[in-house]
Amino acid sequence: MLREITNFVRILPPNNMRRILLLICLFVILVTPAVAQLYQYLDTQNGLSSRRVLSIRKDKKGYMWFLTHEGIDRYNGKQYTHYSLTANGKLLNFFPNLNTLQIDTAGVVWEIGKTGHLFKYNSLQDKFELVCDFANKDKSNSGLPLTASFLDSKDNNILLCTKNKQYLFDIDTHELIQLESPIKEEITYIAKSTNNQYFLASSHKIYCTRLNHGRLEVIKHPELDNFHIVNYIYFHPETQMLVIGTLLDGIYLYNIHSRQLIDVHNGLQDINVNSIIASKENENEVLIATNGAGVYKLNLCTYELTNF
């Protein structure tokens, strides 16, 4: 390539300085790696069904899925496809019944609704199919709506919670069972740590549990017994830390092995946490999205909290 550029420069009029400058410029363009980050603003003007987005997922093809107040949108980078949800021949009202999008081990997109309807995307027919109607499967007093859900992509099941009960849905067999459990209060957030261990959070307490053959066994962690309005929990595998967001007292970190509870100073007091995810740039950091206060970066080793 450089030889071709040199030959091209030689055919120019005899001006040595101009030849040299052109050669240098073209060479720099070719050998310098181009590093660019592309951002695209997506809104209702180019196809998004609503500006109120409840959940976002990226599938194995790279398509983006959005759960909004108006339904489910898939964006392939060029255009949107809108999907409706139908149960028993009736079109479901999207808000406030919708809850979250999840992706299983096979890369299939699921929609888990607060009304107990579980939908699975059928790529062959390009539509969402109802695979579980919670109210029909559980004839007892189920206590709907669902208050929390967690799709475990490793074990291919979905942990579901109602007002005072917990259930397990098998993604492969579509079997729904009520778990034997001593927990009789409303669970609002779920995080999985290692093996069959789950953390279940109510508004003021976090339960450490082990799933064992249809039973939830509570493992006592007194350090997790008293919080002021838990609004999010997230388990970070690399550091073995449970990140706890509370509305009144801010952010806490809990080491599940040493059982040390750490209060993160200046940790977002009186701010609601919407989501916590692992950072792709640093394995010891998480990103915390808030409701109205922006995004923060938290180092789980130094406990340093900074604006992102």
Task: Mark where each language-model region is.
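Carboxylate-rich, polar loop motifs that coordinate divalent cations or form catalytic acidic clusters
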Residues: M1-F308
